[in-house]
């Protein structure tokens, strides 16, 4: 038995929906559930390092408030009231540091809560703490954290993925039943695949980015993670919705994701057309990953789905376009971290000019990958290169969105492997940025188009006995399709 994976029994072994039912029926208290997860964190996180900050008193106080309300006979604040959660350390919180895993923000406590944080609190969900990540969400392994890497509970010599590896590791180890992450090019879906959990990137604009420390504003999207499709849907409904404080927030009804998950749990996919993306089913991927993907497609067929092959030719250019657009936005967004207003300040001894203080602060505060992307973005946006690089990448982005539109004329959802390989060893790709970037091949086209996607467990790869993920992709604002197909697939896996 792997002691770092979810225990076989006890409160930390249960799904969020099961825990909510027990709490709301008063079979157990929210304090008991929250304490059980805090104890689990205490037991295993010294090794896994999924959390950067654990708020014991704050979590228990929130749990006590839920218990007090339920004991008075009041209705639960939400379907998940009382069930604790792990929050990626990129959402600002007034009662805990928000570091984005960077020395630049070490010890920084925000004066306000992110909208997602606020919605979680209003739903009666205790926040266990803030989880580890790649610095400013830049990376695919959680090795770029200034505070050390997170280890994969399935094999502690391997990465849990990134940038949100801390949240996924917390779920996979039973440290938390629910999690919130962000997805810029796969940072929710990719760690979910490597840790055998469920992660969803909602349609861009449907979950508020107010209070989310920006990496690349046109790509970033907060989203839910959990160990089951239903749990993920329940959390999705909590955090989604229009927000007047976010200029990119879309004012439209939230997709009926919970109803879709319950419908999909019947396991019947008759009448559903599922597209297999030709560009994501090819040689070069780990054989065990492709084998599990082909088994997944066979299972979907057995459940009644009609499978069609779709061609998305511009997906081959997605990686290059993404790694031009993202650094350009990073270069702009991270200009605010200058050592003058908040965060790390170096050289503030009266002997340095303001410009020198800024330079010293940024040199000391940012890690190598963040510096690399700032330099790339600044170069691509400079005079003489803007048209040749940035505008060209934006044109490719438009073509990728058109590829998706053509594909969805033929099918309801698309499927692919979530990652080209299973979890890789710690340190294996750190010195080779291109190899690390290639790990996002399957996930980043979705972000460029602003659509929605899910990764869910698709079995262990025969050649490595490590988790693989099936990625499901749906059109904008059709997030419920993810949950219907995902829940059906999940049932078929059992």
Swiss-Prot record:
An annotated GO BP: translation
Keyword tags: ATP-binding, Ligase, Nucleotide-binding, Protein biosynthesis
Annotated catalytic residues: 88, 163, 187
Superkingdom of origin: Bacteria
Catalysed reaction equations from the record: L-glutamyl-tRNA(Gln) + L-glutamine + ATP + H2O = L-glutaminyl-tRNA(Gln) + L-glutamate + ADP + phosphate + H(+)
Enzyme Commission number(s) from the entry: 6.3.5.7
Cellular component terms per the entry's GO annotation: glutamyl-tRNA(Gln) amidotransferase complex
Enzyme class name: ligase
GO molecular function annotations of the record: ATP binding; glutaminyl-tRNA synthase (glutamine-hydrolyzing) activity
Role description: Allows the formation of correctly charged Gln-tRNA(Gln) through the transamidation of misacylated Glu-tRNA(Gln) in organisms which lack glutaminyl-tRNA synthetase. The reaction takes place in the presence of glutamine and ATP through an activated gamma-phospho-Glu-tRNA(Gln).
NCBIfam families reported for this sequence: gatA
Family of this protein: Belongs to the amidase family. GatA subfamily.
Assembly and interaction partners: Heterotrimer of A, B and C subunits.
Matching PANTHER family: GLUTAMYL-TRNA(GLN) AMIDOTRANSFERASE SUBUNIT A (PTHR11895:SF151), TRANSAMIDASE (PTHR11895)
The protein, known as: Glutamyl-tRNA(Gln) amidotransferase subunit A
